[in-house]
């Protein structure tokens, strides 16, 4: 039976989605837009956003600032020590930040302490002249600890503190990892690709990954050739072919480079130096024209300029594909009953009508107000100093079989 989509849209400004939805709202094809009298101008919205970001930064330092001085990030029962180095003079746009995840070579603290110490100096000969280099120590000694979702927020805190304390650039943050650290890079980046300018892995095993999420997060894959029958090398080759195919079908996305290096010290140094050079050409794009968001085993609530309300529980396999073409927003796939679309003036012209097309059919056209409440929500909920939105549309979707 063909699926019929009944879509209702509301611009939910200053009210929670769950409070705005009634039992019959999803059966309507309509739009609710607040009075334009309450809308900000572009200049007013940008000024208000700057003010809130400054407040957010001060509040963040008050809550987490001691963690930078202590070189220790805490989350529940997890403790993540870290080392940091700030090298050279600060560039005009801020230091690039490199987060480097060490291998987990055993299950004892002493062995992994040694790996942590090695990682602190892994790129001594290849780091750029100006940067912040951070090596976190895995909070546990299990082989898969870097893959755990709890690490996402801990790394986010670490990045924010580097931005606030050392003048790092939140849009030039690069995630690196080797072997088990490389495993972690893949899992972290596919869950939260919008946090990173680019990622790089050396070795590692690649399983159960939603690489479609990496459309806007460039990837460097470095394979270590050691002459053995290495399952990781086979997995890596397969993944690189999959990324080749994704880029072939979507030429503006899925930027990646796959290369190999020898296993001795000098060869690794040269190979990883080239990887660092490749990464630095990229700056994070917080508002890409097109996004692909597919849930994995660990579900997330947001992806670039899309999110789901707290009342919606994402499921593994749920997928959204959306893109913006001037003032037209196209949503071609969506498994959620509700979907938030966040906008600002760099994405669309908010002084002109915006059209939303769902499943090939126009479902809304009109001007969207810039709202204080949306700016507040986008700044304080994400705590990401590179993101800011001033308008929001919520799609209410019912699938009738």
Predicted regions and their residues:
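Active-site-adjacent alpha-helix of alpha/beta-hydrolase-fold enzymes
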Residues: 225-255, 344-364
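Active-site machinery of serine-nucleophile hydrolases
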Residues: 94-164
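C-terminal beta-sandwich/jelly-roll accessory domains of carbohydrate-active enzymes
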Residues: 294-401
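A domain-start/cap signature at the N-terminus of enzymes
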Residues: 20-95, 370-392, 399-401
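C-terminal catalytic histidine-bearing segment of alpha/beta-hydrolase fold enzymes
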Residues: 234-237, 244-329, 334-336
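Gly/Ser-rich "nucleophile elbow"/oxyanion-hole loop immediately N-terminal to the catalytic nucleophile
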Residues: 87-93, 143-179, 191-195
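Short beta-strand/loop motif that positions the catalytic acidic residue
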Residues: 220-224
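Short glycine-enriched nucleophile-adjacent loop
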Residues: 182-193, 199
